[in-house]
Amino acid sequence: MNRLCAAVLLFAVLFCLPRSAGAGEPLAVVSETELARIVHEGDGRPLVLVYWASWCVPCRHFREKLEKIRAVYPESELRMLAVSLDRDPGPAMAYLARSPLPYPARIGDAELIKARSGMPVPTTILYRRDESVERELVGDVSEKRLGHYVGRIVRR
Protein backbone atom coordinates (compact mmCIF):
# COMPACT_ATOMS: atom_id res chain seq x y z
CA MET A 1 0.00 0.00 0.00
CA ASN A 2 2.83 2.40 0.85
CA ARG A 3 4.42 1.81 -2.55
CA LEU A 4 1.15 2.55 -4.30
CA CYS A 5 0.77 5.80 -2.35
CA ALA A 6 4.36 6.74 -3.12
CA ALA A 7 3.82 6.02 -6.83
CA VAL A 8 0.65 8.13 -6.93
CA LEU A 9 2.41 10.97 -5.10
CA LEU A 10 5.39 10.82 -7.47
CA PHE A 11 3.05 10.92 -10.47
CA ALA A 12 1.29 13.97 -9.03
CA VAL A 13 4.56 15.74 -8.36
CA LEU A 14 6.05 14.99 -11.76
CA PHE A 15 3.03 15.50 -13.97
CA CYS A 16 0.36 17.55 -12.23
CA LEU A 17 2.06 20.37 -10.36
CA PRO A 18 3.23 23.58 -12.03
CA ARG A 19 6.47 22.83 -13.78
CA SER A 20 8.45 26.03 -14.01
CA ALA A 21 12.05 25.25 -14.87
CA GLY A 22 13.46 28.62 -15.70
CA ALA A 23 14.01 30.10 -19.12
CA GLY A 24 10.42 29.22 -20.00
CA GLU A 25 11.03 25.48 -20.19
CA PRO A 26 9.02 22.75 -18.44
CA LEU A 27 10.73 20.90 -15.63
CA ALA A 28 11.64 17.40 -16.76
CA VAL A 29 13.39 14.39 -15.30
CA VAL A 30 16.79 13.77 -16.88
CA SER A 31 18.71 10.49 -17.08
CA GLU A 32 22.45 9.91 -17.49
CA THR A 33 21.88 9.21 -21.18
CA GLU A 34 19.76 12.31 -21.73
CA LEU A 35 22.24 14.49 -19.82
CA ALA A 36 25.09 13.20 -22.00
CA ARG A 37 23.02 14.07 -25.08
CA ILE A 38 22.39 17.59 -23.75
CA VAL A 39 26.11 18.09 -23.06
CA HIS A 40 27.04 16.95 -26.56
CA GLU A 41 24.38 18.87 -28.51
CA GLY A 42 26.08 22.17 -27.90
CA ASP A 43 26.13 23.47 -31.46
CA GLY A 44 29.39 25.23 -30.66
CA ARG A 45 28.20 26.98 -27.51
CA PRO A 46 29.91 26.29 -24.19
CA LEU A 47 27.89 24.92 -21.26
CA VAL A 48 27.69 25.65 -17.55
CA LEU A 49 26.21 22.57 -15.87
CA VAL A 50 25.44 22.94 -12.17
CA TYR A 51 24.35 20.16 -9.84
CA TRP A 52 22.34 21.46 -6.88
CA ALA A 53 19.77 20.48 -4.28
CA SER A 54 16.83 22.38 -2.79
CA TRP A 55 18.09 21.80 0.79
CA CYS A 56 21.57 23.13 0.01
CA VAL A 57 22.14 26.62 1.46
CA PRO A 58 25.40 27.21 -0.49
CA CYS A 59 23.48 26.34 -3.69
CA ARG A 60 21.11 29.23 -3.04
CA HIS A 61 24.01 31.66 -2.60
CA PHE A 62 25.75 30.30 -5.69
CA ARG A 63 22.55 30.65 -7.70
CA GLU A 64 22.83 34.45 -7.42
CA LYS A 65 26.26 34.29 -9.06
CA LEU A 66 24.92 32.08 -11.84
CA GLU A 67 22.09 34.55 -12.45
CA LYS A 68 24.70 37.30 -12.89
CA ILE A 69 26.55 35.11 -15.39
CA ARG A 70 23.30 34.67 -17.34
CA ALA A 71 22.80 38.44 -17.36
CA VAL A 72 26.25 38.88 -18.94
CA TYR A 73 26.10 35.96 -21.39
CA PRO A 74 22.78 35.33 -23.17
CA GLU A 75 21.64 31.86 -24.24
CA SER A 76 22.94 32.57 -27.75
CA GLU A 77 26.50 32.66 -26.33
CA LEU A 78 26.36 30.29 -23.35
CA ARG A 79 24.18 27.31 -22.48
CA MET A 80 23.35 26.84 -18.81
CA LEU A 81 21.60 23.93 -17.12
CA ALA A 82 20.81 23.20 -13.47
CA VAL A 83 20.28 19.56 -12.47
CA SER A 84 18.68 18.84 -9.10
CA LEU A 85 20.06 15.91 -7.13
CA ASP A 86 17.12 15.91 -4.70
CA ARG A 87 16.02 12.31 -4.04
CA ASP A 88 12.45 13.59 -3.66
CA PRO A 89 11.63 15.90 -6.60
CA GLY A 90 8.85 17.72 -4.72
CA PRO A 91 11.02 20.22 -2.82
CA ALA A 92 13.05 21.08 -5.93
CA MET A 93 9.90 21.61 -7.95
CA ALA A 94 8.37 23.77 -5.22
CA TYR A 95 11.57 25.83 -4.93
CA LEU A 96 11.69 26.44 -8.69
CA ALA A 97 7.97 27.28 -8.79
CA ARG A 98 8.56 29.97 -6.13
CA SER A 99 11.79 31.20 -7.62
CA PRO A 100 12.27 30.33 -11.32
CA LEU A 101 15.74 30.27 -12.81
CA PRO A 102 16.74 32.35 -15.84
CA TYR A 103 18.06 29.15 -17.47
CA PRO A 104 16.74 25.58 -17.84
CA ALA A 105 16.57 23.14 -14.93
CA ARG A 106 16.01 19.40 -14.74
CA ILE A 107 15.44 16.84 -11.99
CA GLY A 108 17.91 13.96 -11.96
CA ASP A 109 16.37 10.50 -12.22
CA ALA A 110 17.19 7.77 -9.69
CA GLU A 111 20.09 6.44 -11.81
CA LEU A 112 21.70 9.86 -12.17
CA ILE A 113 21.24 10.66 -8.48
CA LYS A 114 22.74 7.31 -7.48
CA ALA A 115 25.73 7.87 -9.78
CA ARG A 116 26.33 11.29 -8.19
CA SER A 117 25.53 10.25 -4.59
CA GLY A 118 28.94 11.29 -3.26
CA MET A 119 29.10 14.52 -5.23
CA PRO A 120 29.11 17.69 -3.15
CA VAL A 121 26.63 20.37 -4.12
CA PRO A 122 26.86 22.73 -5.71
CA THR A 123 29.22 21.26 -8.28
CA THR A 124 29.60 23.17 -11.52
CA ILE A 125 31.15 21.68 -14.64
CA LEU A 126 32.24 24.10 -17.35
CA TYR A 127 32.32 22.64 -20.86
CA ARG A 128 34.21 24.28 -23.73
CA ARG A 129 32.75 24.73 -27.19
CA ASP A 130 34.27 21.38 -28.21
CA GLU A 131 32.38 19.71 -25.30
CA SER A 132 35.55 18.98 -23.34
CA VAL A 133 35.67 19.91 -19.66
CA GLU A 134 37.41 23.19 -18.90
CA ARG A 135 36.98 23.09 -15.13
CA GLU A 136 34.99 21.52 -12.33
CA LEU A 137 34.15 23.92 -9.52
CA VAL A 138 33.01 22.55 -6.17
CA GLY A 139 31.05 24.61 -3.68
CA ASP A 140 29.99 28.23 -3.59
CA VAL A 141 33.01 29.62 -5.44
CA SER A 142 33.64 33.35 -5.63
CA GLU A 143 31.95 35.46 -8.26
CA LYS A 144 35.38 36.51 -9.55
CA ARG A 145 36.58 32.91 -9.96
CA LEU A 146 33.34 31.79 -11.60
CA GLY A 147 33.40 34.77 -13.96
CA HIS A 148 37.02 34.10 -14.89
CA TYR A 149 36.40 30.49 -15.92
CA VAL A 150 33.10 31.19 -17.66
CA GLY A 151 34.80 34.00 -19.58
CA ARG A 152 37.46 31.53 -20.71
CA ILE A 153 34.96 29.04 -22.13
CA VAL A 154 32.96 31.76 -23.88
CA ARG A 155 36.02 33.38 -25.49
CA ARG A 156 37.64 30.14 -26.71
Positions of predicted regions on the chain:
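Short pre-active-site segment immediately N-terminal to redox-active cysteine/selenocysteine motifs
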Residues: 45-47, 51-55, 120
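Conserved redox-active cysteine motifs that mediate thiol-disulfide chemistry
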Residues: 51-68
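Hydrophobic beta-strand anchors of alpha/beta hydrolase catalytic cores
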Residues: 48-49, 80, 124
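Conserved segment of the thioredoxin-like fold in thiol-based oxidoreductases
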Residues: 61-64, 71-108
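Bacterial N-terminal signal peptides
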Residues: 7-16
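A short beta-strand-turn-helix
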Residues: 26-47
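Thiol/disulfide oxidoreductase modules built on the thioredoxin-like
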Residues: 97-101, 107-151
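Boundary at the C-terminal end of the N-terminal hydrophobic targeting segment
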Residues: 21-24
